[in-house]
Amino acid sequence: MSSLSPLIALSPLDGRYYSKVVALRPYFSELALIRHRVHVEIEWFKALSHEPAIAEISPFSPDTIAQFDNLITDFSESDGESVKSIEARTNHDVKAIEYWLKERMAKNVEVSKVAEFIHFSCTSEDINNLSYGLMIKHSRDHVMLPALKNIIESLVSKAHQLADTPMLARTHGQPATPSTLGKELAIFAHRLQRGYDSLAVISILGKINGAVGNYNAHLAAYPSFNWEKFSQSFVEKLGLEFNPYTTQIESHDAIATLCDAYAHINTILLDLDRDIWGYISLGYFKQKIKESEVGSSTMPHKVNPIDFENSEGNLGIANALLRHLSEKLPVSRWQRDLTDSTVLRNMGVSLGHTLLSYDSCNKGLNKLEANLERIADDLNGAWEVLAEPIQTIMRRYGLPNPYERLKELTRGKEGISREVIHKFIGGLAIPDTEKKRLRDLTPQNYIGKAAELARDIGK
């Protein structure tokens, strides 16, 4: 395979963003798919050799087992090219794996005598569904979950750091009851952790039961053997969950569930990106800058929230693909059609854009600094938010029309100051201790349990 320059790559994942998503290449490149197919074919061959009921093939020697294992661990780009050259003749990618294995092991007497047990009773989808199952499972466990955990840890760290930093909340874009910066970040840490936990426990299913899922060829060769039990053991030893009821293809319901889980996490992350973008726009966050960088080709002053915008854009692409995968993969005509094959090849693309969005979001989070002066200015100009606790205390003591009186005082009014609020409190028929408690309230300290909630996240 010739080296592809990022400058001429069709996909930006293999071009501009190559270095950001390279961790997925061992799982979703063409070479990775071929290697996983080789792995499954070899493991099936070895499993058959260890089964006493299949008398025509005996357990392989340690040297032969080592040779097989080396084919998997040392599988190279050159090996992949050899497989592709065979595929060019056969026009069948999985059959090319079988022929390549026979060629590579032709000089091994043990193997050559029983070479026809390679791909024994298998349909291509037996090999493919297990290969993709391993690719999807391992990419989740070794790449995607750690990347998501990095974001969660960044959010938890900032939530703790900013737990006591009050801010003016906004509902419908308008000033609302204060919170703290830390608590608002803690919300996303909590949401993403729930998504992480759900994603981590999704079992990927696999099958190896022949052309239409009934073990027809298996039973034709060995009619008294318990092929279902043998197949279940094989699938589970690979680390997948066995699906006993399939057509030619594994139904992909578990992969659809996984895609939905990724898409849901991405939707949460999209919400985070947009909220942070908004806080930067309000001036609540500043971004650390590098002197050498440029924010605009014409406006020298610009420091744009490009990391969150990049993340948002890639999340949109990722979710479009993930939703299509989720909706399309469980649907196949009768005992199968081939539409899932080309769609599954884009699993890595969907996760590539997802991983890129994770990287960009986390990069942006690590640039953030709270702009305490700007946040304080907003709070100092929003004494009307204390209408809520005042009318609530009035309700406690049975004062008439508390909500309506505070509405008349504050709604749509300008110039609501500390003095206006304190004058109103002074005229209330409530105990002096309550008046003092209300006078002690400010937009800065009327934050409820926000600080405590922020400090508790991640514990």
Residues of each region from the PLM?
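Short, well-ordered beta-strand elements within core beta-sheets of diverse protein domains
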Residues: 183, 256-264, 389-396
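Glycine-rich cofactor/substrate-binding loops
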Residues: 2-35, 86-87, 91, 283-285, ...
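Amphipathic alpha-helices that form helix-helix packing interfaces
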Residues: 41-47, 104, 151, 155-158, ...
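Acidic, glycine-rich loop-and-beta core segments that form the ion-binding/anion-interacting portion
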Residues: 222-319
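A helix-coil-helix interface module used to build multimeric assemblies
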Residues: 2-218, 222-233, 295, 308-310, ...
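A structural signal for small-residue-enriched, beta-sheet-centric alpha/beta enzyme cores
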Residues: 124, 219-222, 231, 237, ...
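Conserved helix-loop functional segments at active or binding sites
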Residues: 161-165, 198-201, 205, 236, ...
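Amphipathic alpha-helical coiled-coil segments and their boundaries
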Residues: 136-137, 144, 185, 251, ...
